[in-house]
Every structure is written in C-alpha cells, then in structure tokens.
Regions:
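Polar/charged low-complexity regulatory segments
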Residues: 2-168, 174, 181, 200-264
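Mid-to-C-terminal oligomerization/interaction "stalk" domains of large proteins
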Residues: 177-178, 191
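Short, hydrophobic/aromatic alpha-helical segments in well-folded domains
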Residues: 178-179, 196
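Conserved hydrophobic residue
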Residues: 187-188
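Extended, well-ordered alpha-helical scaffold segments
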Residues: 193-196, 200
C-alpha cells in the first residue's frame, strides 16, 4: 500500500496498464438521429400615417359617431369599419377558405380583385399629382411632404390580403400628402384637391364594404356536393356557389391548396 502525505500519492510511479490489442471490429454505437429544425420565423411591421384622411379611414366610425356627423342626413346611421376590423375579418375569411368553405373562397377572389382595382386607381392619382409637382420651375426645389408627428401603428394580419389592405391605405396616405402639397403651393384648385381625395377615399371604402358585408357560414364543398343539412342551409341563404369556385378553377392568389376531399 502506498503512503500518502497531504493528499499527494508518494508511491513509486508506474505506467498504467494498456489494454491488449484486438483484431475484432470496434463496436459502433447507434447514432441518435439529430433533429434539424429552426425556430419559428418572426417579423414585425409598423407604419406611419401622416394625414387625418388616412387616420380617419384607419379608425373608422361607430354608428353614434356617424349619426352625429350626418345629423341632417335622411339616411340611417351605419357603422363604418376600421382598418383593424377589416384586417380581422379578412383573417376570418381566410381561415374559412382554408377549411374548404367555397363562399369564403368566392369572397377572397372578389376582395383580391377589388384591391387590385383600387390600388391601380390610387397609384394613378399619385402619379398624376407627382407629374403636377414636377411642373414647377427647375430653380425651385420641393422636399417630400410629411407630418411632423405621424401616427405610428403596429400591424399584424393573419392573412396576406389583410396586409394588402394596409398597403392600399398607405398608398392613399401618400396620395393625400401629395394632394395637399400641390394645393398648398397653388398647383391645383380646392375643387381638384377635394376630387382627388374623394376618389382615393372611395377606393378604400369599397374594400371595406366588401369585407363588412361578409357573413360567415360553417359549410364545406363536400356539404354543398352531398346536399347535407349544412349545405342546403348555406344554399338557401347565399345561393349556389359558382361552379368555377367549387372546382377550384377560380381562386385567390393567396388561397390555400384545395384538399382532394374538397373535390380538387
């Protein structure tokens, strides 16, 4: 037995015994399958609105606000959707489309087409005003117009078309800024200014009305084809879905892929 002092081994040093060499194949431990998976993708979006016209379209108006504003109007007051409500409703329609609802599919097609048309209208006005602003003498330099304190808003949408609605509103905000700039410098009249603003605002409100008038119904293509109670009730309320919508021939660019069960 070796002596130790203060925990230090004082025994004569010996080489450790080495294992005998072997000619057998080494044992290979089964490798654990490595899980190659990245984390969830994440992105945030914020926007600045510079004009009261765009901010009012973002906020919408409740029935009581509409009644106060239109006190002399003979029309009954109605609720005007806000952009967050439009985004939320577009998300609901998108999820119904994912669940194979042909009526939701039809509305997505209608909504996408309307957004394309309204976007073109707004962009044409922006281009027209931009050309007017360029008509000033070359010795004059105008800076881009913007609010000294814009409204900063965080935006989240569960559907691509919800974001397309937001892009449209941002385009209208740019339109309004350029229109007010052109009017401020005497390049357009007040009547022309109001005409441009009304044209752009109407393009936005058309999108709002499409989404606002949507009524959800729990039904699938199979319900329609099999004439289930849910399918018959939906047909009674909203009519027979378009054949091209049912077959999937006509769909929104952002719709999910049709499942085979749904008749694709």
């Amino acid at each position: 037995m070796s002596d130790t002092e203060n925990g230090v081994d004082k025994a004569p040093h010996q080489e450790p015994a080495l294992p005998e060499p072997t000619t057998s194949s080494p044992t290979i431990q089964p490798s654990r399958e490595r899980e190659s998976r990245s984390g969830a993708l994440k992105s945030s979006l914020t926007l600045d609105l510079h004009t009261h016209y765009a901010i009012r379209l973002w906020d919408g108006r409740r029935k009581e606000q509409t009644a106060t504003a239109d006190v002399n109007s003979q029309r009954p007051p109605r609720h005007i959707f806000s952009m967050p409500q439009v985004i939320s409703r577009a998300g609901q329609v998108y999820q119904a489309s994912v669940a194979d609802n042909p009526y939701a599919d039809a509305l997505l097609v209608r909504l996408e087409d309307a957004i394309e048309i309204s976007t073109d209208k707004v962009q044409k006005v922006v281009q027209e005003i931009s050309e007017i602003l360029k008509s000033i003498p070359v010795s004059i330099k105008l800076t881009d117009v913007m609010s000294v304190s814009p409204l900063n808003i965080g935006v989240y949408s569960s559907s691509p078309l919800g974001y397309r609605c937001v892009w449209l509103l941002v385009g209208y905000d740019q339109l309004a800024m350029k229109v007010f700039q052109a009017f401020h410098y005497g390049l357009i009249s007040r009547a022309t200014r109001d005409q441009y603003l009304d044209k752009g605002g109407y393009a936005i409100r058309q999108i709002y009305s499409i989404v606002q008038n949507y009524r959800a119904v729990a039904v699938t293509r199979n319900d329609i084809l099999a004439r289930t109670p849910a399918g018959l009730k939906a047909i009674e309320l909203y009519g027979e879905p378009d054949a091209d919508i049912m077959s999937g021939k006509v769909r929104s660019s952002f719709s999910a892929r049709l499942s085979p069960i749904g008749g694709a």
